[in-house]
């Protein structure tokens, strides 16, 4: 049986597109949240990791649909849609299964919340039989592995000197040979500290003739990355009790996770408690209740930078430090300011000591139900049941941050820099009430009819408060006594919002001879967030399935065990509009009002609306067609499914330009369309099966092609995204890197033409894609001419005539679209079992997406592979201070994010039952795993950047831009599972 919306079904009777992740899959991978368990194991689901402790990754089911509204799926925990809670609060060890509903015929049952897919999470319940106690504990050790080949201090000194020599600005006393006085001028500013003088003295030794011998290896190098990182250590413990009889069941669990990642100032703790109970006091009544409580503490050290510029954490700050800068004074104390060329860069070790950024979460998810079986009262009502679900979610968070005197001012306010404290509180509460009527009938063993009727109501509210203080009197008070600050406090802020939903739904499942299946669903949804007259809408769906293996002519083919064709169509909605957005928000402002003698003006506080109200704002709608085949052959040694889908989203929520005479520039409106088309394959093969040995492989492959079909006002381009009709939703639209200019006759001629047009390019610098230079005889129609100039700007007498095809303009015709989202993703899991031993390894891959992150200088450290006359195949440009065209150099940072990651290699041993009887245990297993042992890919991976890590990227655009070096963390996990 598998879980579907508002019920369960036999897997063979499912007509929609769905996938399942079981507790066995979760156990096989030591994950901290549910998303990690799904990565690469489910077709159509693209998940990227987030190595920051306690944080979720990013998830998309069958691509992006909306430009401005939410693209995240709906989570349903034990039948209750999640609004106030978070999937991060659910301990993965408490999860029995996760069903992922992907097409509209499956998700339309959730109406306005199903457009982005639905993930049904079922937690573990008590089981009938003997009472069991289980323990699962693991310890892991990890380290940050960077493959970036950075320059050491001596190499960086040579790099800077060569840059000045190439640019003709070195002017040393010994020609191009090292000159200590000139080198100091390259590195030091007039206000610099003396420690660099002492370090440079070791590099230069004066000879008897007054010249200097030079040994750059004597220049000390500080490994800043080593100083701010540590050996990661995580321990995770879970103990559970399961008991049950025919009339009652109970499941109780306690969990504890303590995670210390390689960054010294980041850690995460989570405490969870879960209880699920069910009693059957009579034959006609069943009552159940579940309560999941969690408390978590996250510490992230410095302020998280969510932009695409600047460091994101202490490691990013450390990588911005020059390698020649010492971390400590001679007396062993931390160096106060450790940057020679920019006093704003403080020693990141001080930041670790003087910065706290702690978030505490308290969460409760409550679910309950009561079910009446009317068939126990009266035989004609057999198969008729009434069920009431009541659920509530509460989440309270407190974010406290404190930045001491040694920390780089996070709020960019020099007048209020020291001892800054910030305190933010928020709480979210939601409740859901559902009444369901089930009617299940079988007629003459031929017809089966299952009817589900639903009435649902949901309410949500959130409120928050924040305050900030400067020059905190007692640093030890952190953010707990902001009122005692010596300086004027930042104006406190608060917020509040609430919304409600109401729904009515009907679903009919019909089966004919257990071969022909039909599912029809209709849901009528209302949402308070939308405008009057548009609050309610109807979302229908239908799906057909043909179980061909039940046909006699198929049963004659012995090697076919399962063959089911499915087709489904449905409409879902997305009402992800902020409350009150249809009415326009109001803020305070100052108005200048003339009055009195001489028309004197006075500033008076008034109010104004920020955005023009839209009283017709409605739903985004997605219509989806899905065609699928489920199959199993050779005694199900080979089984799987193939899916093809088209999803079209209309009435997108976008800001539309309006006449300024209205008093506003834009209005949020339902305009625009997008489309997703895709192909998915999941395959499970039992490659070898003998008495003692089994080899099984599970494959997933997903291809998604998303496009914008229409923008506001019929425009073909909108710079907001940027968005372009016919292109993916999340894209870069920019110039293209071609190669590095070479010192060849062909390149020199082309550079001469550019120089004569006012564009100076030099050998060893980046060449950007341009329209080709097509030289033609002078006077040719449609041609232009240019007089060639030499490097000094003097005319050489040579005239070049070329076609006016856009050459030398560098405009939109030279740009291209870079897709941030992958074109295809997948995973391969191989499992080898020999007697009581099991060895498995899981591979995850993503291809076809582009990143903006391949920088030659990550922070201020510079990679070695730079162009020179003897290294013409280099990865990066030649260093030079010469005047040249540099405004296009950034385009070199675009690179493919293709990657193949071996996520884990696991070895386990299950202790034989004959051994366990002697100690009274029912089960025992020991295991060891290696996480992220191998990462393969293109330039991005070779540069030491992990494309699977969200930490340093712009997550809002589902990966894309990055300036922080996000290395990969490799770990060894040791664990044991015991059952009694």
What name fits each language-model region?
Residues 189, 197-242, 247-253, 329-377, ...:
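Outer-membrane beta-barrel transmembrane strand signature
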Residues 54-56, 542, 851:
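Beta-rich nucleic-acid/ligand-interaction surfaces
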Residues 26-28, 44, 52, 66, ...:
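Extracellular/periplasmic, surface-exposed regions of secreted and cell-surface proteins
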Residues 82, 90, 101-104, 113-117, ...:
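Short, glycine/acidic-rich beta->alpha junctions
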Residues 839-901:
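C-terminal beta-barrel architecture of Gram-negative outer-membrane proteins
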Residues 1-274, 286-288, 292-294, 308, ...:
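Short, small/polar-rich motifs associated with maturation and membrane association
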Residues 134-215, 466, 581, 669, ...:
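Conserved small-residue
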Residues 114, 125, 139, 255-256, ...:
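A short beta-strand motif that forms part of the nucleic acid-binding face
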């Amino acid at each position: 049986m598998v879980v579907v919306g508002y019920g369960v079904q036999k897997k063979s009777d499912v007509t929609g597109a769905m996938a399942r992740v079981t507790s066995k899959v979760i156990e096989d991978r030591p994950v901290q949240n549910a998303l990690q368990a799904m990565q690469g194991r489910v077709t159509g689901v693209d998940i990227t990791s987030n190595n920051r402790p306690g944080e979720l990754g990013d998830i998309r089911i069958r691509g992006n649909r909306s430009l401005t509204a939410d693209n995240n799926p709906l989570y349903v925990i034990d039948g209750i849609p999640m609004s106030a809670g978070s999937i991060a609060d659910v301990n993965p060890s408490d999860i029995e299964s996760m069903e992922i509903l992907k097409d509209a015929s499956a998700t339309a049952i959730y109406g306005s919340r199903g457009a982005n897919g639905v993930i049904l999470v079922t937690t573990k319940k008590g089981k009938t039989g003997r009472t069991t106690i289980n323990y699962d504990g693991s310890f892991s050790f990890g380290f940050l592995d960077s493959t970036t080949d950075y320059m050491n201090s001596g190499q960086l000194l040579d790099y800077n000197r060569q840059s000045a020599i190439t640019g003709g600005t070195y002017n040393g006393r010994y020609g191009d040979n090292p000159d200590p006085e000139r080198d100091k001028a390259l590195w030091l500013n007039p206000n610099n500290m003396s420690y660099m003088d002492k370090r440079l003295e070791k590099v230069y030794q004066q000879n008897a003739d007054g010249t200097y011998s030079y040994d750059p290896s004597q220049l000390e190098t500080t490994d800043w990355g080593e100083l701010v990182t540590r050996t990661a250590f995580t321990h995770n413990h879970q103990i559970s009790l399961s008991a049950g009889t025919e009339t009652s069941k109970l499941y109780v669990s306690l969990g504890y996770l303590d995670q210390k990642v390689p960054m010294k100032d980041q850690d995460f703790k989570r405490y969870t408690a879960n209880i699920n109970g069910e009693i059957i006091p009579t034959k006609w009544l069943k009552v159940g209740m579940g309560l999941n409580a969690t408390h978590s503490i996250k510490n992230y050290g410095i302020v998280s930078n969510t932009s695409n510029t600047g460091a994101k954490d202490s490691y990013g700050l450390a990588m911005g430090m020059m390698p020649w800068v010492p971390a400590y004074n001679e007396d062993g104390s931390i160096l106060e300011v450790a940057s020679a060329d920019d006093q704003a860069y403080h020693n990141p070790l001080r930041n670790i000591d003087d910065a706290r950024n702690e978030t505490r979460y308290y969460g409760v998810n409550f679910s309950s139900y009561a079910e009446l079986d009317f068939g126990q009262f009266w035989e004609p009502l057999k198969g008729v049941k009434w069920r009431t679900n009541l659920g509530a979610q509460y989440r309270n968070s407190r974010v406290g941050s404190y930045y001491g005197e040694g920390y780089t001012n996070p709020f960019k306010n020099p007048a209020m820099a020291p001892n800054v404290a910030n305190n933010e509180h928020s709480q979210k509460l939601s409740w859901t009430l559902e009444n369901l009527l089930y009617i299940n009938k079988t007629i003459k063993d031929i017809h089966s009819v299952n009817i589900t009727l639903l009435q649902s109501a949901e309410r949500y509210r959130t409120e928050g408060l924040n305050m900030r203080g400067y020059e905190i009197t007692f640093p030890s008070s952190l953010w707990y006594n902001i009122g005692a600050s010596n300086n004027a406090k930042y104006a406190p802020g608060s917020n509040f919002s609430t919304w409600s939903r109401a729904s009515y739904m009907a679903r009919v499942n019909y089966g004919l001879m257990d071969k022909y299946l039909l599912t029809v669903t209709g849901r009528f949804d209302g949402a308070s967030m939308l405008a009057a007259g548009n609050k309610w809408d109807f979302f229908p769906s239908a799906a057909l399935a043909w179980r061909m293996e039940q046909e006699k002519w198929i049963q004659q083919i012995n090697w076919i065990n399962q063959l089911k064709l499915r087709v489904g169509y449905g409409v879902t909605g997305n009402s992800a509009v902020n409350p009150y957005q249809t009415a326009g928000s109001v803020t305070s402002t100052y108005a200048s009002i003339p009055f009195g003698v001489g028309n004197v003006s006075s500033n008076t506080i008034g109010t104004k609306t920020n955005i023009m109200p839209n009283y017709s704002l409605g739903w985004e709608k997605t219509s989806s067609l899905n065609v699928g085949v489920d199959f199993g052959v050779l005694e199900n040694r080979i089984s799987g499914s193939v899916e093809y889908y088209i999803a079209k989203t209309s009435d997108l929520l976008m800001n539309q330009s309006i006449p300024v005479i209205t008093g506003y520039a834009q209005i949020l409106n339902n305009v625009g369309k997008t489309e997703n088309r895709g192909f998915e394959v999941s395959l499970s093969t039992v490659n070898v099966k003998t008495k003692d040995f089994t080899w099984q492989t599970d494959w997933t492959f997903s291809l998604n092609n998303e496009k914008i079909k229409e923008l506001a006002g019929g425009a073909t381009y909108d710079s907001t995204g940027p968005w372009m009709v016919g292109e993916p939703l999340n894209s870069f639209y920019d110039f293209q890197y071609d190669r590095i200019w070479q010192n060849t006759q062909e390149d020199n001629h082309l550079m001469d033409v550019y120089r004569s047009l006012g564009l100076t390019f030099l050998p060893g610098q980046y060449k950007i894609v341009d329209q080709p230079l097509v030289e033609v005889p002078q006077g040719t129609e449609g041609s232009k001419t240019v007089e060639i100039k030499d490097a000094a700007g003097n005319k050489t007498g040579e005239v070049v005539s070329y076609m006016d095809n856009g050459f030398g303009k560098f405009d939109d015709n030279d740009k291209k679209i870079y897709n941030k989202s992958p074109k295809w993703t997948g995973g391969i899991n191989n499992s080898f079992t020999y007697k009581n031993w099991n060895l498995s390894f899981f591979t995850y891959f993503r291809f076809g997406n582009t990143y903006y992150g391949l920088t030659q200088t990550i922070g201020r450290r510079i990679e070695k592979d730079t162009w020179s006359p003897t290294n013409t195949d280099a990865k990066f440009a030649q260093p030079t201070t010469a005047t040249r065209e540099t405004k296009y150099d950034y385009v070199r940072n675009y690179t493919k994010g293709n990657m193949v990651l071996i996520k884990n290699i696991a070895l386990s041993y299950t202790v034989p039952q004959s051994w366990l009887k002697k100690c009274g245990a029912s089960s025992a297993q020991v295991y060891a795993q290696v996480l992220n042992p191998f990462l393969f890919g293109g330039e991005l991976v070779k540069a030491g950047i992990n494309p699977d890590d969200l930490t340093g990227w712009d997550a809002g655009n589902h990966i894309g831009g990055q300036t922080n070096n996000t290395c990969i963390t490799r770990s060894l996990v040791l664990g044991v599972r015991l059952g009694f």
